[in-house]
Amino acid sequence: MEGPEIKAVEAVIDNGSFGRRTVRFETGRLARQADGAVAAYLDDDSMVLSTTTAGSSPKENYDFFPLTVDVEEKMYAAGKIPGSFFRREGRPSSEAILACRIIDRPLRPLFPHTLRNEVQVVETVLAVNPEDSYDVLALNAASASTLISGLPFTGPVGGVRLALIDGQWVAFPRWSERERAVFEIVVAGRVVESGDVAIAMIEAGAGKNAWNLIYDEGQQKPDEEVVAGGLEAAKPFIKVLCDAQNELKRLAAKETREFTLFPEYTDDLYNRIDEIAHADLDEALSIAEKLPRQERIAEIKQRVKDTLSVEFTDMDEMEKDKEIGNAFKELQRQIVRRRILTQDYRIDGRGLRDIRTLSAEIDVVPRVHGSALFQRGETQILGITTLNMLKMEQQIDALSGPTTKRYMHNYEMPPYSTGETGRVGSPKRREIGHGALAEKAIVPVLPSREEFPYAIRQVSEAIGSNGSTSMGSVCASTLSLLAAGVPLKAPVAGIAMGLVSGDVDGQHIYKTLTDILGAEDAFGDMDFKVAGTADFITALQLDTKLDGIPADVLAGALKQAHEARKTILEVINECIDGPAEMSPFAPRIITTTVPVDKIGEVIGPKGKMINQIQEDTGAEIAIEDDGTVYISSEGGEAAEKAKQIIDEIANPHVPQAGETYKGTVVKTTSFGAFVNLTPGIDGLLHISQIRNLADGQRIDAVEDVLKEGDSVEVVVQGVDDRGKISLAIPGFENQENNAGGRRSDDRPRRDDRRHSDDRRRDDRPRRRSDDRDRDYDDRPRRRRDYDDDRDYDDRPRRRSHRDYDDDRDYDDRPRRSDRRRDYDDDRPRRRRNDDRNPRYVADENYDEYREGREVRHERPRRRVRRDFDPFDD
């Protein structure tokens, strides 16, 4: 489909030796009724459709901007059918929710915060290359569709993912390239009037193989300086993407519509509240503890409402209450920010770089595999670790990327953590995002599957919240994992950094805060979370309320966060300086390897062998395709026993004559019992030997003495050339195994019976026809005598028993339907066999039939000669 209404632009991303990537924006073809619709392509191989639509009227009683971002993952985009019961897409995956968050965070600050019309951005993933991620492409598509929609949006926003591979920052890296990435960073920003790029969002983390790449291959560590360099490296790519979107706006943008904006309060109301409450609020905002401070602020707010109830009588009461609340909150914000900018004074009296009181404790919950409590000020995080077999790792039905996850981090924040009530249940987007960030911080220091073959689930319970629960989760997870015996390569700690900016004496300044409170997060301009070891950064996240933040300000915040991180790591090391002994309630997992060609023997037909081992030992067994075997049990003894059995199967010991075994009867027959000696090796205990268990008495059946599952002590009597094992009861090794007095191994073979010993089986006379002198193939054919000179194929064909004229074609014989008698229409039809079988006679004629005819089953049955030979001449 082509036409003048279709507009398209391209942005070329040059990665040097890693090649080029092309991002193309197209509008006018799809979703024409949406306010803005853009299809974004990455190398014409991945495709995301972005639509932006605004409600026609403002939402009533909303005191915030109602922006929603949804990502629709279509499994057909990857050539898959959904694995759910209904075989269709359902609730969004965690990957889709995380993509929603990285789109929402840079877009929201670029709308007027007083807009009350609902705005919805929908990203539909239509096609995706398995080597690419769609999230950053969707971010650029969302910015483009919003830019041309006619909404009051001060974009565009450009987004790029960079990976540090072999010392080079690569944009839009493929999954195969990301395997060698030391660090990955997603940066979104906008181009300001000066031409520089202001950063609006960061989502970053060290690669899963970063530790090995750094310490084994000598790759560059992603410390504060390197990460700051990554922010600078992202700017040219962001500028190229923003330029392409601006060109699309020039070609296809709608005119900006007029929307009603709803000021949160009037200036007169704000000034009056400032007169009444400024001094009291200034004092209340110096109370260090959260709950007493909130109680005091609530008292002041109520006094303000009482004072203003007789004033501003021309306002609606509901509107007046809303505006008083908004103006009162803005006054608090201005007081807190002004003190920080002019006095370096924070709410709880700390300096800009000070950290709240820290405490750490392990083993706080009984019976769990690992637990810890980390506290920073009034923020409390309870970390719980659970270990299990690798088969319990999470299976991910994703469009691209990894399909399994060995380390699963879940973050939960119940409403009581802030002293409130609310819904408890399935996780919200914020909880999923915080869990993913904490998971990203821990993954680079986890031991490998070979070093620690466990699936690990980490749960962070935010039981008390007053700022930075996500970074508190990182600290609690480190403590809990070490307490569970997980050999982390290094401890990890996290800290949340804040920012306050403003004009002081005609100069715009930035103040960076270490370890922000919840109120400082709400009243500040930035929430900058940084996690890492003592040597490098493992995770990073930036949210901001500003249009963008200069990169040098963020670089300074990274260095300030490093100082705080080292302080927290000292507290962690004082609590636990290495992995503890594993809990007695945790499963013990050991590994062994078997040759690939022996995997089938270990598993057995339909899993019989492996199930039997698990049943006998109580251990759980998982086998990888490469022959690695993971064995788990609550106690180490069961796992060791299962390992011994598996090793015997993989490297079997062939029983030798004279060896004694304690075996198990696995099968009984009329001539004896098969006894399992070692896994996969059975021997035959002859019935003549089984009599010895019955004091030599004759037995009618083997089952009278031995049954399947019985244990019996046996000795190997002999092993023949075919590997068949003969068994005996200890003390009766020399007893013959048959009634004829000969040893079973000495009995003649079937081939040798009734023939002289020097004659081979193949030398015995063949069964021939009566004519011994005639060649075998010249024997007369069965049933018919043919002339010897007549070809076999000339014999008469088998015909019907009817006689046909020779000159009549065979197919001209009368059909069965033609041989039927012609009946008058009034004549009743004969039922099948009605003259012999009364079951087919109509009910009304049945009595008459019984009187006049003989019932079939009363007749004598016809006898058949059993000695009749149809071929006997």
UniProtKB/Swiss-Prot annotation:
Superkingdom, natural source: Bacteria
Swiss-Prot/TrEMBL cofactor(s): Mg(2+)
UniProt-annotated stretches for the region Disordered: 727-873
Predominant location category: cytoplasm
Top-level class of the enzyme under EC nomenclature: transferase
Entry GO MF terms: 3'-5'-RNA exonuclease activity; magnesium ion binding; polyribonucleotide nucleotidyltransferase activity; RNA binding
Basic and acidic residues compositional bias, start-end: 742-857
Tagged with keyword Disulfide bond: no
Family annotation (PROSITE patterns): KH_TYPE_1, S1
Protein's job: Involved in mRNA degradation. Catalyzes the phosphorolysis of single-stranded polyribonucleotides processively in the 3'- to 5'-direction.
Record protein name field: Polyribonucleotide nucleotidyltransferase
Species: Bifidobacterium animalis subsp. lactis (strain AD011)
